[in-house]
Amino acid sequence: NKRGLPISCFLNEANDSLNGIVDLWTENVWLAARGGGIGSYWGNLRSIGESVGGVGKTSGIVPFIKVMDSLTLAISQGSLRRGSAAVYLPIDHPEIEEFIEIRRPTGGDPNRKALNLHHGILISDSFMRAVEDDDQWDLRSPKDQTVQKTVSARSLWIRLLTARVETGEPYLVFKDRVNNLRPEQQKLAGLEIKTSNLCSEITLPTGTDHHGKERTAVCCLSSVNIEKFYEWENDKNFIPDIMRFLDNVIQDFIDNAPDTMETAAYSAMRERSVGLGAVSYTHLTLPTNHPV
């Protein structure tokens, strides 16, 4: 089957221009067509009502996210494996209040909803301190950092938590903590982590890198069955062999990715990111009555 690819985890971002938005849509269409799970960052875009080209006003991020919602659904319906996507926004973006409610099926304009996308919010340490102190919180233009609106940090936090209780989302990504824990080589290269993926477990740099090239982050994920731990615990090559296999999968993606995934193949080549997790821990502990 030539339709699928060995990688299904991608992270990208939209630039603050019509070309940048259309490029993101186009890339996401091709990723979804191959069954990709996508996490897209929209925090670079100016908010609704900000000036464009000195004469017009931007319509904000929500209409563009709505188009991404429709594109993902349309492409997924024709695929063997459904592609899915998540969208991310920082907590200081001027449209954050509407963004929190974007998956809520009731209330507001149905044309400004994205019910088929998942969504997440990048939380900063300064915002959490403002919540703790019950301070005001400035919502700033991504273009020039001018204050567009000021809200109660605690009220915004309560609104966010209410949405999570009632709808299960948005995801929360504590971006300062994530960036503090970046590998040293990423810090030295000035690579910033702005977003996460469809399931919010991957944190990799996206956008323009220190070489002036665009990155669509790629990660190859797998897991080991901990229930079978005693079958391989003394095999010193077990984990290294798995990691080598995952790196081979990355190479297969690099070798076979189509031109429409050029930025993803470039990112995979530069980073070769892999992740190995574990499943069935409870099944390991229950027979021996060990506490979980």
Task: Identify what each model region corresponds to.
Residues 65, 107-120:
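Acidic, His- and aromatic-enriched active-site or binding-groove loops in soluble protein domains
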Residues 96-104:
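Short active-site loop/helix that positions an aromatic residue
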Residues 101, 121-158, 165:
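Polar, glycine-rich mid-to-C-terminal structural blocks
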